[in-house]
Amino acid sequence: MKKYLISALIVAGLTFTGAASAKKLKFQMSSKAGDWAHTYMGEKAKILSDLTDGKLQIEGLPTKSVVPHRETIDAVANGILDGDFNAIAYFAGRDPAFAIMGDLIAGYDTPKQYQEYCMHGGGKEMLQKIYDSVLPGKILVLGCGPYGKEALVSKVPINGVADLKGVKIRSPEGLAADVFRRAGASPSSIPFSEVYTS
């Protein structure tokens, strides 16, 4: 993911390399200021700025600093933000395919498998079609940024499907939430930045 993020940011910057003045892009993230993802993005943004002699800069804004996390694609489409570094499963309410592309629980063994699908198996093009179905011609997909598998943490023992009944679970929207709901759980989609405070 590290190499890919730099590549995606450089691709985004190719449009601006001939510009006489610096271009500063504002990307809203799904993480709070200071957490690992926000820090990571800041480090990569500095590398990008150095590689372009300061002609292209990216400011990673913390979650909800401009718009709520589920409204970032509208903000990009309307020119309020220049980019979005967010979990696309949050947009599953608009098109269920966002859930499949954004958080296919147990669909891949590693983030690298998903990255390979995105870059070499048609995934990036599929994701572009999904965005175009919601906001035609307003969003350009530069790539995918998969996360590794997350743990299912619970205050009560879960030894099988029956133990999920009545348990409140953090889950992405769409397919995953539907599976948990059918198993009797109460799925809730909350941003990662709010996990420890919920």
Whereabouts are the PLM-identified features?
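Sec/Tat signal peptide C-region and signal peptidase I cleavage site
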Residues: F16-A22
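Bacterial N-terminal signal peptides
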Residues: S7-T15
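Contiguous mixed-secondary-structure segments that line small-molecule binding/active-site clefts
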Residues: A45-K46, A87-P187
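Alpha-to-beta junction loops
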Residues: D53-L56, T72-N86, K168, A185-P187
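Short helix-initiation/N-cap motifs at beta->coil->alpha
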Residues: L61-D74, E173-L175, S188-T197
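Extracytoplasmic "Venus flytrap"
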Residues: K26-K44, T63-V67
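Positively charged n-region of N-terminal signal peptides that target proteins for export
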Residues: M1-Y4
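Signal peptide-proximal N-terminal region
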Residues: A45-I58
